[in-house]
Amino acid sequence: MTRIWAKRGTRPRAPRDQRYEWDYIFGAACPQRRATAALVLPAANSEALALHLAEISRQVNPGAHAALVFDGAGYHIAKDLAVPENITLIRLPPRAPELNPMENVWEYLRGNRLAITVFEDYDDIVDKTCAAWTFFANDPERVASITTRSWATVNA
């Protein structure tokens, strides 16, 4: 669901795709460094998350440690999830997505880059999803603006 501008009392038209194909953006952002790490994958499961954690681990500065905020999705809490040594997972309480800074990123991407779009095929879904993430990741000010939370800042 998205929002669009329309005259009061009118019913705006928007393209709609009723197929059931999708991909998943596994994304993370560091507001202080204004850096991001992401993978676009065909499934959301513990194997895909392990790939994402490995990608984040590679992007963490040497000697640094990353704290990732996670919700309670099943694959986020898998017992066999391999978490790299330079990453700590912070699990949110149930039904509290507003505490996850990345939720605003997903809302932004859906509302500004991916909404009201009909995709040609699966490859087009992947291409446009990657383009949406790249648009976000290439703007350090936007990364900081959307993901910064005063309660989540660690001062060294």
Where are these regions (language model features)?
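Residues that scaffold the ATP/ADP-binding catalytic core of kinase and kinase-like folds
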Residues: 39, 78, 108
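RNase H-like polynucleotidyl transferase catalytic core
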Residues: 6, 10-18, 85-104, 118
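Extended, low-complexity cationic-aromatic segments
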Residues: 1-54, 148-156
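RNase H-like two-metal-ion nuclease catalytic core shared by retroviral integrases
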Residues: 22, 70-72, 90-114, 125
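RNase H-like DDE/DDD metal-dependent nuclease/strand-transfer catalytic core used by mobile genetic elements
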Residues: 48-92
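C-terminal anion-handling pockets and recognition modules
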Residues: 102-156
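Short, solvent-exposed loop/turn segments at secondary-structure junctions
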Residues: 30-33, 73-76, 95-97
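Short, well-ordered secondary-structure micro-motifs
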Residues: 1, 78-81, 102
